[in-house]
């Protein structure tokens, strides 16, 4: 039971109990555990000593006296946004973005080569916490347009089998297709898979043999599992401004792809390498 598990956690060697579901209830369980001898006085003192030692090492007692334990937001932003840190972010993006596989002669992209672009934006819904950065698709679309590309956002049409728009409406209109996938795992969602739009998987990449297609994942590096036939695939691993700017530089040939796969983006599947 939780009543026993709470004190047994400390007795087993954990010094601090975090992420309590109900602090009053868990406090009472802890107190009863001490009274019942589940947590011995020796173990209690050991845990408290370690906790206080950590706080002392962090000088929290001094910061509490000065009122600086929680920094003022303005001061924090001054530290977080200094040029040295921004330079680190740019360097990290430049060195990490990975061209996982490439169809010959698709890259680099330029407005002269691909004037009209069809843009597919696949992203998670906003939630409470641990969620993806919202609006990445809008940001990247504007970046493409700023370079001179004409970009249309894909919107699924209403219809059903036999009544959808003709294939040639896309293949005869667009010079390039770009998928930007912004899906991210979080604490209680350990698997992320692409869920295709209705009707009938309207945004599935089916024009790859007719229109050059580039797929970009800005978070999860394993999406080839769901789109193995995509011939040009890029992982950026993050969606901040520095990553998006570096991505565009590399797509347009102004910077080389330097990243080396830190994981297996092919997911041990033979068809993802085709």
For the regions a language model picked out, list residue spans one by one.
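Preference for extracellular/luminal or secreted protein segments
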Residues: 2-274
